[in-house]
């Protein structure tokens, strides 16, 4: 009798455990050769966690529960997507000097993330090849893309059979290549199809009927958003209109907002796409006089208070970079690793250029350009600004490149500085007079008309 009682209690205990599945999520990792002092994790547009790397290159956190979804892990200036589900226990290793190429996941839930990383790298390797195929006919191009799509599908089938993914993970991992190749086809049509008739458009775009235009689960997934941006761009083009010319016009971006309003169903997706279009329009500084008109329409479409605040702030920051205004003050770090105000720098007309410690090839080409400009414009001071804080490695780079450390600085808070100075591209250059007033807040160092 007692044995039966104990057996019953044990079975009840087991059943009780089964009714309470593990929902905890562990996320940790190590950053080799860090390019900044922290790692941030985002869910949607919200910061979930920030890990400081001051005393260690490792970080970790156990969460009692997290909603399944696509999270973003950022180590400035790079980021990657991570697919997390209940009971995942993931460790990620990163070498910041080769961020995407070095990404390796291990632990429970690693396989789906390694698959996403592998797909991304394979697609990047295919970019040059596919660009070379833009001269082929629509039929030939579709055949090429279909062949690559079939190859990725076979890889996915093998990965799924070995790991028994959840339906949610299956959807995300399949979307990584399905929407990527759909986006490539949209771009081909965008660049080559401006003379197609309606029948040619319909034949080429047959893949669209298999796709979803309101998938909120993918609202923060790059392949999906990239596809939709190409889709709405193509839909916004007028018959015979050239994309490379049209994209410079505010009216074109207004038409893209109309496509979002009429064709995109998911609220989160709509808001993300409208935000992306708003960024492209506002950062097209040649359209500055038309931005108020654009924003009026954007305000009607957007339903996200945080995005509204963000876009308005960007517009205001851009206004503060108008010619004749004083350059907004930020805190910089000099080559002695001491902090100072940017207001202390203006002794003579100055050209500010930017570089990243993780993109040394870009830095080398930048320095070649700067040395040429220095020889031609001795009345200007040319100041380099690393978008990451300076460190001993950066100081060694200055010596190797034979740069005057007195003209080299680093940002100590990229988030604040990039907003105040509207730093969105490494080729961005700011030209200042000796009073610290802006002459050109949005010059491009590599453009042919830079010296004008």
Labelled PLM ranges:
Residues 361-401, 413-417:
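Structural microenvironment flanking redox-active thiols in thiol-disulfide oxidoreductases
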């Amino acid at each position: 009798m007692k044995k039966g009682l104990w057996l019953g209690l044990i079975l009840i205990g087991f059943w009780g455990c089964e009714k309470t599945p593990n929902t905890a999520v562990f996320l940790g990792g190590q950053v080799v050769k860090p390019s900044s002092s922290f790692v941030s994790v985002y869910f949607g547009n919200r910061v979930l966690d920030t890990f400081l790397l001051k005393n260690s290159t490792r970080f970790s956190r156990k969460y009692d529960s997290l909603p399944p979804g696509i999270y973003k892990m950022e180590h400035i200036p790079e980021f990657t997507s991570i697919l997390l589900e209940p009971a995942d226990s993931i460790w990620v290793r990163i070498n910041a000097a080769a961020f995407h190429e070095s990404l390796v996941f291990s632990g429970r839930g690693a396989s789906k993330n390694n698959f996403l990383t592998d797909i991304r790298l394979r697609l990047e390797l295919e970019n040059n090849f596919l660009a070379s195929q833009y001269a082929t006919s629509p039929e030939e191009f579709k055949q090429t893309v279909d062949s690559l799509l079939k190859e990725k599908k076979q890889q996915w089938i093998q990965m799924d059979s070995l790991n028994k993914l959840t339906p949610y993970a299956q959807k995300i991992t399949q979307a990584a290549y399905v929407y990527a190749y759909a986006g490539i086809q949209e771009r081909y049509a965008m660049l080559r199809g401006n003379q197609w008739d309606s029948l040619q458009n319909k034949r080429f775009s047959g893949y669209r009927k298999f796709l979803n235009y309101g998938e909120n689960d993918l609202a923060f997934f790059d392949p999906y958003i990239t596809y939709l941006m190409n889709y709405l761009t193509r839909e916004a083009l007028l018959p015979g209109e050239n994309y490379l010319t049209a994209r410079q016009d505010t009216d074109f971006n207004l038409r893209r907002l109309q496509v979002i309003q009429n064709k995109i169903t998911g609220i989160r997706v709509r808001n993300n796409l409208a935000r992306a279009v708003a960024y492209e329009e506002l950062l097209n500084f040649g359209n500055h006089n038309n931005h108020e008109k654009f924003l009026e329409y954007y305000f009607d479409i957007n339903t996200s208070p945080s995005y509204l605040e963000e876009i308005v702030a960007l517009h205001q920051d851009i206004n503060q970079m108008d010619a004749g205004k004083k350059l907004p003050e930020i805190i910089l770090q000099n080559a002695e690793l001491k902090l100072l105000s940017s207001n202390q720098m203006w002794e003579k007309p100055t050209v500010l250029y930017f570089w990243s410690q993780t993109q040394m090839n870009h830095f080398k080409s930048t320095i070649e350009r700067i040395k040429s400009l220095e020889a031609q414009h001795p009345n200007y001071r040319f100041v380099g600004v690393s978008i990451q804080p300076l460190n001993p490695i950066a100081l060694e780079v200055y010596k190797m490149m034979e740069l005057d450390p007195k003209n080299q600085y680093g940002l100590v808070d990229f988030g604040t500085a990039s907003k105040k100075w509207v730093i969105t591209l490494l080729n961005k250059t700011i030209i200042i007079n000796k009073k610290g007033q802006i002459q050109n807040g949005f010059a491009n160092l590599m453009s042919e008309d830079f010296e004008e």
